[in-house]
Amino acid sequence: MAGRLKNKKTLITAAGQGIGRSTVLAFVCEGAQVLATDIDPDSLAILKEECPQIKTRLLDVTKTEAIQQLAEETGAIDVLFNCAGFVHHGTLLDCEESDWDFSFDLNVRSMYRMIRAFLPAMLESGRGSIVNMSSVASSVKGLPNRFVYGASKAAVVGLTKSVAMDFIK
């Protein structure tokens, strides 16, 4: 079933490694026009060598101005795949307030920033899909020693459902 994403203009965050990287490779195999973003220039360069048909862009998803600039330059996209995230290891007692703040900034607020920047053009064009990467750590059971990670990924589920209820027709 190759070609399911043929010519779909796609932006993927945290594309240099892990799930983001695998998503880039899978989307390219399905025919997507991929813009791969990451904060690590070396991982993007390696990805570009392996997949020369993609475009790459350095992007720190914790920086609203950088996201807004990219949205203005890019215009309407068909798929926004929010994959950036951070796993804090530990329980509530191991979690400092700074760990909580960083985890929620990267795992949740960055998705808010990306959606806020790219959704208007999607709505104007009458098309678009948003994928927000969550985790089984957000489930009813959760995972041990992933306190703030699980809490932040549960917030991703809530954010996703709220956006969907407001904008899916």
Annotate the PLM regions.
Residues T91-L92, D99-F104:
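Substrate-binding pocket helix/loop in short-chain dehydrogenase/reductase
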Residues G16-Q17:
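Conserved glycine-rich cofactor-binding loop
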Residues I115, S152, T160:
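Active-site helix of classical SDR
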Residues C95, K141-G150, S162:
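Active-site loop-to-helix junction immediately N-terminal to the catalytic Tyr of the SDR YXXXK motif
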Residues P120, M165-D166:
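Alpha-helical segment proximal to the catalytic Tyr-Lys
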Residues S135:
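Residue(s) in the substrate-gating loop at a strand-loop-helix junction
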Residues A84-H88:
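Conserved NAD(P)H cofactor-binding loop of Rossmann-fold oxidoreductase domains
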